[in-house]
Regions:
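N-terminal organellar transit peptides
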Residues: 1-96, 101-163
Length: 163
């Protein structure tokens, strides 16, 4: 395997029929303090490195930034070639959304999948707090829509599981 960064390694395909492998083994979104984690931009660069063709994405991530995660989900859903997502550890929070991007979704026997309502922090005025609450509600609806579409569960079942 070729190492790209601390969070991602990839294996080039031996033939056009064999999948390339990307491993997401860190938080989603870059850490503001230490620079660890995977941004949507870095993931896009990695996708370009492996090129078109079948892809396996192995996931062991606690989740992280919703915006980066949704962009990664959309990039994977937009691929022309088949994508298999494989949870090999934990797919928590926004990493669970990325796991649902696969055309085929696999979970290892000793793996975990965790969903919840989005959360965030804000400092400021009461108007700032209301804006944040509205943004969180909007994100919750987007996430619930993906869970509903990709799992076949009802919206009510998904919303209950997220709270």
């Amino acid at each position: 395997m070729t190492k790209v960064t601390n969070w991602l390694s990839y294996s080039p395909r031996a033939s056009v029929h064999e999948p390339a492998v990307l491993q997401i083994f860190d938080q989603i979104g870059e850490d503001w303090f230490g620079g660890s984690g995977i941004s949507a931009k870095a993931f896009s660069d990695a996708l370009q490195s492996v090129g078109p063709g079948p892809l396996v994405v192995e996931i062991n991530s606690p989740g992280g930034n919703v915006w980066d995660g949704l962009a990664i989900y959309n990039m994977l859903r937009g691929r022309q070639a088949p994508v298999t997502t494989r949870v090999v550890g934990i797919a928590a929070s926004i990493a669970s959304i990325i796991a649902l991007a696969g055309d085929s979704i696999e979970m290892a026997e000793a793996s975990l999948f965790m969903i919840h309502d989005p959360s965030g922090m804000v400092a400021g005025t009461s108007d700032d707090m209301r804006k944040m609450a509205n943004a969180l509600d909007q994100h919750a609806e987007i996430l619930a829509g993906i869970y509903t579409k990709r799992t076949g569960k009802t919206s009510a079942q998904i919303r209950a599981a997220m709270t």
